[in-house]
Curated annotation (Swiss-Prot):
GO molecular function: 2,3,4,5-tetrahydropyridine-2,6-dicarboxylate N-succinyltransferase activity; nucleotidyltransferase activity
GO cellular component labels: cytoplasm
Positions of substrate binding: 104, 141
Protein's name in the database: 2,3,4,5-tetrahydropyridine-2,6-dicarboxylate N-succinyltransferase
Species the sequence originates in: Legionella pneumophila (strain Corby)
Pfam family, one: Hexapep_2
EC number per UniProt: 2.3.1.117
RNA-binding listed as a keyword: no
């Protein structure tokens, strides 16, 4: 455990007794260092190590401490004002800085400081919360939201109105993770630390939380909390044991390898299942 982490961990344990007046300058500086590291990609709340996702809980704790200790302030957005504890990421960004970042931000695309946005990403009028990590080549479409500490892989498309859940409110143990080359359909919601593995396609209007049944029609298995790599997923229902009712589920209708995913359009993958 490094000294920065140790300071954050200790402060979080004693958070009930903390206030801006009682917090040390070392703690305030440590929190700001974490927020800056999250903002520029030096830190990330979760990362894949040896094929498994590891969550750095202390970084999340630093974000929570910032909410407790930092006062609200006026944020001038030009067309109106906001009043919040966390400033916006691009408030003071120059034309040169935008050009160097390689990010395109459409008017009303909102990103909080402490979220990392990699190059070749396009943000339509959308919202990205603090602690989120968005890798290269991502499209965040209109009215989509990327929640606090969510992890978005390379070349992901998050369609209009889709929601990727956060972990801060309500407090969740692990962030929601969308791995590389995934497509998230319009108005879908993926929350509560669900992991969508690489090369998967989530159809429009699919809702995934930790309690959502994920039915694999190929194997007949039911699982929770994770979509396997290369899955094509649609919304469905499973009947009760007595046949009196059915309840919502997500259905894995097929699984494709990376080569097939690269050759076949997303629309073709989804439409192929309408004939079954």
């Amino acid at each position: 455990m490094n000294s920065l982490q140790a300071l954050i961990e200790q402060a979080f344990e004693n958070r009930q007794n903390l206030s801006l007046d009682t917090a040390s300058s070392d703690l305030i500086n440590a929190i700001n260092e974490v927020l800056s590291g999250l903002d520029n990609g030096q830190f990330r709340v979760a990362e894949k190590i040896n094929g498994e996702w590891t969550v750095h809980q202390w970084l999340k704790k630093a974000v929570l401490l910032s909410f407790k200790l930092f006062p609200n302030q006026i944020i001038d957005a030009g067309f109106c004002q906001f009043y919040d504890k966390i400033p916006l990421k691009y408030t003071d960004c120059s034309n040169e800085q935008f050009s160097q970042s390689g990010v395109r931000v459409v008017p009303h695309g909102m990103v909080r400081r402490g979220a990392y946005i990699a190059k070749n990403t396009v943000l339509m009028p959308s919202y990205v919360n603090i602690g989120a990590y968005i890798d290269e080549g991502v499209m965040v479409d209109t009215w989509a939201t990327v929640g606090s500490c969510a992890q978005i892989g390379k070349n992901v498309h998050i369609s209009g109105g889709a929601g990727i859940g956060g972990v801060l409110e309500p407090l969740q143990a692990n962030p929601t993770i969308i791995e590389d080359n995934c497509f998230i359909g319009a108005r879908s919601e993926i929350v509560e630390g669900v992991i969508v593995e690489k090369n998967s396609v989530i159809s429009m209007g699919v809702f995934l939380g930790q309690s959502t049944k994920i039915y694999n029609r190929i194997t007949g298995e039911v699982s929770y909390g994770r979509i396997p790599a290369g899955s094509v997923v649609v919304a469905g229902n499973l009947p009760s044991h007595d046949g009196s009712h059915s309840l919502y589920c997500a259905v894995i209708v097929k699984q494709v390898d990376e080569k097939t995913r690269a050759k076949v359009s997303i629309n073709d993958l989804l439409r192929a299942n309408q004939d079954d």
